[in-house]
Amino acid sequence: TVLDLSGFDTGKVTTMINMFYGCNSLTTLDVSKFNTSEVRDMLSMFQDCKKLQNIDLSNFDTSKVTNMHNMFYNCKSLTALDLSGFDTGKVTRMGYMFDGCNSLTSLDVSNFDTSKLTSMVNMFNGCNSLTSLDVSNFDTSNVTDMKYMFNGCNSLTSLNVSNFDTSKVMNMNGMFQGCKSLSMLDVSNFDTSEVTDMSKMFEGCHSLTTLDVSGFNTSKVTKMERIFFNCGLLTTLDVSK
């Protein structure tokens, strides 16, 4: 349950892929002395560390990292994660990054530079203890996949995606599926001109009373099954265009 890495010199390490993958009995992990200034890949670094309750990454230098896919996937016991100091300017992949982190009550990604990201698939999928999540400054101008991005975030009471640039997004399948505590959601500015899949996009959004999708361009959409399924409180829905 304990791993002593205090003597590790990581100054020349360029990849930390799968470094702690499957260490599912670790409860604590001290990587505060890690020098990550040369690391370019953190794919699945902490994946399936199911009992890890906290981790201090405040000293991580991520300025050269391009891949954070699956980084904290299935870290079921993490309750808080402060990544406000992460430099993500070169990262292109963040899919599944926090997928299955169902004990997280605090997650700070507000300073993420997402300008080079192409995939946000399943990024926050199953983060069902989060009551708030600030993604208002996310630059999504290069993202093509938002499938299940917020799926199962059933404790979120607010979510500001009004500034999302979705002009390149092709997949929105299940994007907000199961966000049952959201009482409002502004997607009125979404550019959906490239989207082909909207299946289950708002399925199970029980608390939404109004939803403006009147500006949605659905000319390329081939899948819409269950898009508003079980949106039981919707009293206003404009799909006239």
How would you describe each model-predicted region?
Residues T1-K241:
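Negatively charged
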